[in-house]
Amino acid sequence: MQVMNNETSHVIRFGDWSALSADAKAIRFEVFVAEQNVPAEIELDDMDAVCLHAVAYDGAGVPIGTGRLLPDGHIGRMAVRKTARGSGVGGALLQALMAQARARGDRRVVLSAQTHAAPFYQRHGFSIAGDEFYEAGIAHIDMQLTFA
């Protein structure tokens, strides 16, 4: 399945790990491992195999953003390449993953945001649902959104 966004001329493709792993992994390693110094050995986990993955592609077909939706309604591994930040790709990915969760019957979605990104998620309707904690040496905060 794919979603077109004409405003920013990108396409979002959904699939399982076998279909999207090469592109999702490339983005995640660029953002989390290379930029944020997350250890490579903890970036990939067993949950990738059971998630619905989303990858955004620019007009030339280059992968520029990714995220995943776990079976329990947790959105995670949201990452956008530096060159595409500020273009609306992150918001489009988030909204697309939320729509997938809602369509399958989830009543709410949750995520663990890097603290500096909390305002981004709040603009999309998420509220803070816990205290700050550290994961891979990076400050995070749990957030949630309940569908109306």
Language-model features: where?
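Conserved active-site alpha-helix within GNAT-family acetyltransferase domains
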Residues: 115-139
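Short hydrophobic/aromatic beta-strand or adjacent loop that forms the aromatic wall/cage
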Residues: 51, 138-142
